[in-house]
A protein has these predicted regions:
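Conserved Class I SAM-dependent methyltransferase catalytic core
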Residues: 104-159
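Short, low-complexity, polar/charged sequence segments that are solvent-exposed and flexible
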Residues: 63-66, 80-82, 147-149
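Flexible loop/turn segments at secondary-structure boundaries
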Residues: 69-71, 135-138, 170-171
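SAM-dependent methyltransferase catalytic-core segment centered on the flexible catalytic loop
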Residues: 69-122
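SAM-dependent nucleic-acid methyltransferase catalytic core
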Residues: 1-76, 87-98
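Charged/polar, solvent-exposed surface patches and flexible loops
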Residues: 31, 51, 55, 81, ...
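Conserved S-adenosyl-L-methionine
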Residues: 160-170
């Protein structure tokens, strides 16, 4: 996955490509070495968080849902496909696979309800949430789907909330 980005004719994501871009002569794909001293009870999941939290309990749950209307699957479908090695049919000039079943409700007007359901279903001592609200700094597609007020209301209904804010430069 790291090697793919070095020869991609994209701008860091895979939703669009740069026409007439030059490729390197070769691509070397290497497998990163897994960390061998991980605690044996640590687990990593790759599935819809709203489904996952119904089946697990944890000390800490870290969530980083999509912030705006830009669907992750549109930008990172190629990396996801290589990681899973599913080789789906592709279509169109850009040779994209059908991603309709991968769309996230967090990128729609249903984001607040999906977030509330997620938080209510989490069984953990701590929830760590990363959420970027650009407010009026970006274009309309960059605007957060869940307001800060709704996030705080939902989290406060679950338990004690501490907010840590970090300034950032919008691009």
């Amino acid at each position: 996955l790291y090697g793919m980005d070095k020869i991609a004719v994209t701008c860091g994501h895979y939703d669009a490509y740069r026409k007439n871009a030059e490729f390197e002569d070769s691509l070397e794909l290497s497998v990163p070495l897994a960390k061998v001293d991980n605690h044996p009870l640590n687990q990593c999941f790759n599935e819809d968080a709203n489904n996952l939290v119904k089946r697990i309990e944890a000390d800490l749950v870290y969530i980083d849902p999509p912030y705006n209307s830009r669907q992750y699957c549109d930008s990172y479908h190629l990396l996801e496909n290589v990681a899973r090695w599913e080789k789906p049919q592709v279509f169109g000039v850009a040779k994209k696979m059908d991603r309709s079943g991968m769309k996230s409700k967090y990128c729609t007007t249903g984001a607040t309800k999906a977030f509330e359901t997620l938080i209510n279903d989490i069984k953990a001592k701590y929830i760590l949430l990363s959420y970027n609200n650009m407010a009026d700094k970006g274009n309309c597609r960059s605007n957060a789907k869940i307001s800060d007020e709704d996030i705080l209301k939902i989290l406060n209904a679950k338990g004690t909330v501490k907010v840590f804010e970090e300034s950032y430069k919008a691009f």
